[in-house]
């Protein structure tokens, strides 16, 4: 491969909660490991790979100038987004005026809700649910109504369209948050599924907030379908949210963006976000996006997805062979696997907290699935060198799931 996805980079002391926050965030971060075990971060959703070199190059080049005053986004910022969306997702007709900066995807979610629904109103969200949705939507004063995903006979997560319709009607819901690809389940929705969902939202006059931050992390054999692309109505009722952060490991720089084609919808969302003045772009995050959304970035992402596919294949095969009673739906996108440990816990007389604590004790920091509405689940991040995935599997085998 052209790019390095095998080096183990020491992140300690380099502003990374993935390694430095163990034992410091009760209920979220793993406990500190026992002496003799180094930390393998498999919890928070960032990667343990160096970003594409062009990101650093663009940041360094800008940082060599000694002034960082007020600024307007460069035309190149919009050009890179338009070209990236065209190349990666086949998006046509995207113009600079359709694009707006967001100081995080969750900020975009809340701004859209504030533009269209009243505090106390219900918002439809699928479950399992990304914990960030839960915290931000509820903190903003809205009531979440969950429509649970269902596993089909092949173990693939599916939307329950009848349940969606029923929940929308019963709760008089006019806003829905759609996660595509889905976190934490890793589902890449097919066109006909999105079409059917969007038709239901049309019938119930719902504004749709489509979180597509994972849209570049798509495993072989699958394709991301932008929600706005499935119909003209979907294009006009959807606020789509993107970022280079998940793709290029840039969460610490903060720099998301929205795509809104509907002028009225766009004006209302921007009016809300402008009132707080929170939504100002950071000059270095602008240059990071410009550096990421280059031809080299495309090559890097293609290689990354090959690496992630290999990691997921290894991990899932290991679970099948060694962890009897643990099940999962193989992800089609993202770098997360959502493990269902219900049967294992029942057979061994343990609970999910024991699995979390014992994993952390031997340096494997995976994430509690309960805040994602997985009652006996663990969310596992596989965006790290394969050698670390192998080491984590070995420790979990010897010291946790098959400890003697």
Where are these regions (language model features)?
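PLP-dependent enzyme catalytic core of the Aspartate aminotransferase-like
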Residues: 234, 347-350, 357-404
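Hydrophobic residues in well-ordered beta-strands that form the structural core
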Residues: 125, 146, 210, 366-368
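A short helix->loop->beta-strand "cap" motif at the edges of active sites that frequently abuts
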Residues: 142, 203-206, 235-236
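N-terminal small-domain helix-loop-helix segment of the aminotransferase-like
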Residues: 2-104, 111, 295, 403-404
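Conserved PLP-binding catalytic core of the aspartate aminotransferase-like
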Residues: 308-309, 322-361, 378
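Conserved core of the PLP fold type I
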Residues: 68-199, 216-217, 221-229, 233, ...
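PLP-dependent aminotransferase class I/II
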Residues: 237-321, 327-331
């Amino acid at each position: 491969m052209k790019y390095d996805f095998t080096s183990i980079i020491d992140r300690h002391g380099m502003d990374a909660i993935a390694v430095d926050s163990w034992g410091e965030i009760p209920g979220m971060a793993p406990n500190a490991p026992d002496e003799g075990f180094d930390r393998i971060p498999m919890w928070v959703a960032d990667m343990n790979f160096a970003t594409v070199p062009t990101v650093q190059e663009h940041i360094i080049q800008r940082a060599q100038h000694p002034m960082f005053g007020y600024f307007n986004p460069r035309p190149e910022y919009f050009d890179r987004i338009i070209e990236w969306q065209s190349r990666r997702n086949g998006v046509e007709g995207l113009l600079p005026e359709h694009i707006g900066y967001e100081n995080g995807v969750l900020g975009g979610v809340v701004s859209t809700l504030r533009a269209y629904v009243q505090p106390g109103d219900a918002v439809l969200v699928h479950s399992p649910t990304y914990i960030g949705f839960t915290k931000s939507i509820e903190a903003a004063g809205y009531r979440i109504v969950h429509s649970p995903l269902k596993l089909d006979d092949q173990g693939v997560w599916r939307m329950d369209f009848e349940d969606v319709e029923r929940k929308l009607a019963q709760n008089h819901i006019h806003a829905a948050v759609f996660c595509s690809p889905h976190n934490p389940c890793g589902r890449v929705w097919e066109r006909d599924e999105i079409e059917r969902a969007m038709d239901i939202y049309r019938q119930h006059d719902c504004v749709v907030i489509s979180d597509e931050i994972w849209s570049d992390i798509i495993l072989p054999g699958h394709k991301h379908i932008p929600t706005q692309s499935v119909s003209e109505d979907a294009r006009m009722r959807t606020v789509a949210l993107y970022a280079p952060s998940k793709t290029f490991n840039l969460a610490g720089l903060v720099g998301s963006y929205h795509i809104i084609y509907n002028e009225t919808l766009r004006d209302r969302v921007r009016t809300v976000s402008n009132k707080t003045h929170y939504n100002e772009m950071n000059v270095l995050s602008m240059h990071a996006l410009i550096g990421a959304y280059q031809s080299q970035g495309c090559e890097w992402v293609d290689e990354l997805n090959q690496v992630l596919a290999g990691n997921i294949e290894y991990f899932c095969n290991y679970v099948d062979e060694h962890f009897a009673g643990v099940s999962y739906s193989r992800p089609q996108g993202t770098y997360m696997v959502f493990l269902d440990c219900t049967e294992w816990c029942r057979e061994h007389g343990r609970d999910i907290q024991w699995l979390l604590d014992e994993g952390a004790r031997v340096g494997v920091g995976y994430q509690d699935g309960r805040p994602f509405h997985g009652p006996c689940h663990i969310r596992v991040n596989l965006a790290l060198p394969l050698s670390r995935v192998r080491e984590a599997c070995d420790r979990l085998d010897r010291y946790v799931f098959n400890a003697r």
